[in-house]
Regions:
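Extracellular/oxidizing-compartment recognition motifs
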Residues: 1-366, 375, 391-396, 411-415, ...
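Active-site core of glycosidic bond-cleaving carbohydrate-active enzymes
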Residues: 122, 371-669
Length: 669
């Protein structure tokens, strides 16, 4: 699928010798596979930081120098002590990304030092493809067509990084950093690495490397807007939720301890809420060496406030966040509104999109850090509207295409070593392909990914009953909406992960909508096909539409008409004339999860109800973006309010529907 981005490598994969002879552990499996047993992972091989160094000589007159580099799980690259970049984007071993970087400006004539910090986490989660014993790195440096380095690197395991436990859904480790164990200056040319050993080559390494099709992350230096001296330290306010690593300097005595608590909210004027609503406990320890120290945390978090406490007399200064995100230039976005509330809503949605746009479109940058297929619908659309960039969207479509190695019907999170499947999300893939084409006009990608979309189509065709509707889709979770308390009393049994018996509305609206999108894609590609959509649309109306009420019902045996049963039908234009869907939405408002608001609002546009869509965006009920602002949001929430979900993320880009919807409304004027 991506063969044109593969390369033949001259150098080999090197590793920490602890991993040299280990066979990869299996992590890919169907979520409900009863035969899969999670393999035992050695505890002593988790949370491993390894440092690699290599000399690089640059001759006079060298014009351009390129570096190809990858690492598993993740690397940070320094040249002559200067930070260069980090990566790669998370990916499966059979299509593992490498980065290609122009490093010319970081080099000097003569001897240089390449320094790479490689992290292997060892956990099974949505953030990394880890927990599989694949560890190490590979690198080549080229100048004017000539290879400048071999694969002989020196290595040392970084000893200063410890942990007391994991955060959220085993998404990351906390960090206990002991400066007394640090190889101070290891990134610099003058550092004495004579005691370091040569890193072994990992024979029979099974990474299949392909060029990462997107840019590397951008880093911004953000300083606190407010610094408050408290009794035993400092309270820092950065003004908004930021995704990144906190950094600072300290001068103290050997053994002094600084406790670092981060959070999105305050408990009081002098205390941060470091146990986040989204079940992340942010509390790290920094143990000082004698004299000056510089904090270098490796893993990123999402936070606004930092509380620093110490019982020592250490001097603390240079507080900042290395704020990370995918390149984000919204200067060409021309949308403007005189409505002050719209301006505020736009800002919190934009901030959420920027924070969640990392090397993938993350659901949130703290709890899961995963690229969810359903969320992609909203986030990628909003990101395009803001920046005009479609590269990250295209990469995401291929990321999910790669997941069909596990299941032809596609995984709900990709990449990542945690397996999750959601039927609703898989059925949105065809719409996402069509949306990508409308944004990019990239017909070739549409052609490449059509077989993937057809695989999903055929996967769900097997669940057809006598009239063409699908039922008993028990191999994947039927979501409808999330959290479950915002399903508007949807009248169907939706346990997780196996749905109840019968034929219900939303899964069929998505199925018929998928058929509609597939026919549009085939038309664009001028591929002949046997039409199915028109007939299935009529069947959907016969199965779920109530002539008496002018509304769709939740299942073939229900008389209840939820918002969801009508919103998805409106989104795909499955309704007959003279329906009462707009009146239902006007009455109910946004009695749904934030994610489903995208489908509600676009459904209203299809119905010709622009004014009602605008009213819903600006409404001031408990189910509104205004409510998020009222509760202090700087980034859009996962739910309409902090207490409307048991583990609400306060930075969730699936809440950014107003951005594409408002721009669509402006274009229709």
């Amino acid at each position: 699928m991506e063969e044109n981005r593969k390369k033949i490598w001259k150098n080999h994969w090197i590793c920490n010798p602890k991993f040299e002879d280990l066979k990869p552990l299996p992590t890919l499996h169907k979520q409900q596979d009863p035969t899969f047993r999670k393999p035992e992972h050695r505890k002593d091989l988790k949370n491993i930081h390894t440092l690699f160094r290599k000399k690089l000589k640059i001759e006079a007159g060298t014009k351009r120098v390129r570096m190809d580099i990858s690492a598993d799980d993740y690397y940070k690259l320094y040249i002559n002590g200067q930070y260069v970049t980090q990566g790669p984007a998370n990916s499966y071993a059979f299509c593992y990304y490498y980065n290609q970087i122009d490093i010319t400006d970081y080099l000097q004539e003569g001897e240089n030092i390449l320094a790479v910090h490689v992290y292997y986490q060892g956990l099974v989660n949505r953030a990394y493809n880890s927990g599989d014993y694949r560890q190490g790195m590979i690198a080549e440096v080229w100048a004017d067509g000539v290879s400048l380095i071999d694969d002989v690197w020196k290595y040392k395991e970084a000893e200063e990084y410890g942990a007391s436990g994991t955060i959220a859904y085993e998404t990351q480790f906390d960090e206990i950093i002991d400066e007394r164990k640090k190889a101070v200056g290891w990134k610099m040319p003058e550092y004495d690495d004579s005691g370091w050993k040569t890193a072994p080559i990992r024979e029979n390494d099974d990474h299949e490397l392909i060029l990462q099709p997107t840019k590397n992350l951008e880093m911004e230096h953000r300083v606190p807007l407010h610094i408050k001296k408290i009794e035993d330290g400092y309270l820092l306010d950065f003004g908004e939720d930021l995704t990144g690593t906190f950094a600072m300097k300290a001068n103290g005595k050997s053994g002094d301890i600084i406790t670092i608590r981060c959070g999105e909210e305050l408990l009081s004027e002098v205390q941060v809420r470091n146990e986040l609503r989204c079940n992340c406990l942010y509390e790290d320890k920094w143990i000082l060496k004698e004299g000056e120290n510089e904090l270098e945390e490796f893993e990123y978090k999402c936070f606004r406030y930092v509380q620093l406490t110490t019982e020592s007399s250490a001097e603390l200064w240079d507080f900042h966040v290395d704020y990370r995100h995918y390149p984000f230039d919204d200067s060409s976005c021309t949308y403007h509104s005189e409505d002050a509330l719209i301006g505020q809503i736009w800002e919190i949605c934009k901030n959420a999109v920027r924070n969640c746009s990392q090397e993938a479109f993350l659901d949130c940058p703290h709890r899961e850090k995963g690229q969810y297929l359903g969320d992609l619908t909203v986030t990628a659309h909003a990101f395009y509207c803001l920046t005009g960039d479609t590269d990250l969207f295209r990469k995401a479509l291929f990321d999910f295409a790669h997941s069909t190695v596990v299941c032809e019907g596609m995984m709900a999170v990709a990449p990542g070593s945690f397996m999750q499947e959601i039927a609703d999300f898989s059925l949105l893939y065809a719409y996402q392909l069509l949306l990508y084409y409308r944004c990019s006009k990239d017909l070739e990608t549409l052609r490449k990914l059509l077989p993937v979309a057809e695989g999903i189509e055929w996967y769900f065709d097997r669940f057809q009953r006598f009239d063409g509707m699908i039922e008993n889709v028990k191999t994947k979770w039927n979501l409808v909406d999330w959290p479950e308390n915002l399903r508007d009393d949807y009248d169907f049994d939706l346990p997780q992960p196996v749905v109840g018996d019968g034929c219900h509305n939303v899964i069929n609206a998505l199925y018929v909508g998928m058929k509609k999108c597939m026919e549009e894609i085939r038309d664009l590609l001028q591929i002949e096909y046997q039409p199915q959509y028109a007939a299935l649309r009529k069947t959907f109306i016969r199965a779920f539409y109530c002539e008496e009420t002018g509304l769709f019902v939740d299942s073939v045996v229900s008389s209840h008409s939820s918002l969801h049963a009508n919103a998805f039908a409106a989104f795909y234009g499955l309704y007959p004339e003279n329906n009462q869907i707009a009146d239902l939405i006007r009455k109910k408002g946004l009695c749904c999860g934030v994610f489903v608001s995208y489908f509600v609002l676009y459904g209203l546009l299809n119905l010709g109800e622009k004014e009602l869509a605008y009213e819903l965006i600006t409404n001031k009920s408990e189910h509104s973006w205004y409510n998020m602002i009222r509760e202090g949001a700087t980034t859009a929430f996962e739910a309409w309010g902090k207490d409307q979900k048991w583990n609400t993320s306060l930075c969730h880009a699936w809440a950014s529907a107003p951005i594409p919807v408002l721009m669509e409304m402006e274009q229709q004027n």
